[in-house]
Amino acid sequence: MSTIKDLNLAPSGERKIRWVEAHMPVLRDIGSDFAREKPFAGLKIALSVHLEAKTAYLCRVLEMGGAEMHVTGSNPLSTQDDVAAALAAKGMDVHAVYGCTDEEYQAHLRSVLSVGPNIIIDDGGDLVHLMHTEFTDLIPQVIGGCEETTTGIHRLRIMDRAGTLRFPMIMVNDADCKHLFDNRYGTGQSVWDGIMRTTNLVVAGKYVVVSGYGWCGKGVALRAKGLGAKVIVTEVDPIRALEAVMDGYEVMPMMDAAAIGVIFVSVTGCKDVITLEHCERMKDGAIVSNAGHFNVEIDMEALDRCADEIYEARHNIDAYRLPNGKTIYVIAQGRLVNLAAGDGHPAEIMDMSFAVQAMSAEYLVRTRGQLKPGVVSVPAEIDDNIARRKLKAMGVSIDSLSCSQKEYLNG
């Protein structure tokens, strides 16, 4: 039996799913293939991804392929209750409620793992971690899994180096059709959508501090610049810092940037990027947000412990009045700003990311028993297939190499 907020919310969620389906042509095309070929017939898939409409459509595409789906969210504040209800109303096993406690969140993860999945689709690594700590007896029946995020892949690589990862995990985030588009264009747009709809403040003319200049940070900085902000980048990697300088941004240590910025976006995948000491240096009224996976980039524990007063300033914005008299505003409790305070990436972008997930899951079944435990790259042919499908859907044609050109390039 599903664990959701209210089944009566299903019609609203169904409308959302139909909308994204109309704007995800590649995934729709793959769904048609799956419906015909049934690659997942007789298999159980456990999925933990931010549970909103685009994820719901991915679940339905996998179900078209014959999978028995067991679904939960990957963040308590990103679940959309109406979408969860829409899936449950059609008979899918769903365990996700917006705003659930950490204990309830863990219970939801356990619910989808307890069925004994054959494939795991993860976002941040929580399912895989729990499988290796509490459900080890079920590991032999796991064919493999797919990981969506930079943070999750980081956790998997640690396990892989330690020799503790006991089944193959495909690094979906590292696929070109994922990180070059989802991380840069998707994050860039959705982060500012979340910040602007939550604060209702202008970005133009303000100093924006972007912590981290990976693909996600590049996207956030680019869109901030396009909105008229004066962008400062903080980094620990000298190569990325140099990239930011060459891209026209100011680069400085976080302690220096803290005294200048008005809006802060942490997008590193690391912990304690914005600390209490940084917050104490910020201007009165500074706005702090996180676009990394977990709510550890901002030291929320220190803020909760040291603030003289904490109150809700606006829906999804908490005010922290510090002992020095300044008030700092934190969006969505320091959780993912684009999902906890918005609808996540545009459907057209997630069309490619979730196409990689779907085709990678099918690849796991097709190569069952051939892949060794550990992290596995997305095959180049999957990237190529998805890119060609996307171009076709967009009505874009490209050239192809002639025989003589191929001979020249191949020696």
Annotate the PLM regions.
Residues 66-68, 92, 138-140, 167, ...:
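A short helix->loop->beta-strand "cap" motif at the edges of active sites that frequently abuts
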Residues 49-67, 178, 182, 186-261, ...:
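Glycine-rich phosphate/diphosphate-binding loop of Rossmann-like nucleotide-binding domains
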Residues 47-55, 75-79, 125-127, 215:
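Gly/Ser/Thr-rich loops at beta-strand to alpha-helix junctions
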Residues 73, 120-123, 136-151, 270, ...:
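ADP-ribose/adenylate-binding Rossmann-like module
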Residues 115-116, 259-260, 281-284:
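Alpha-helix C-terminal capping/helix-to-coil transition sites in glycosyltransferase folds
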Residues 11-26, 40-44, 52, 167-205, ...:
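Adenosine-phosphate binding glycine-rich loop
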Residues 2-40, 71-79, 84-206:
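Glycine/serine-rich phosphate-binding loop and adjoining beta1-alpha1 elements at the start
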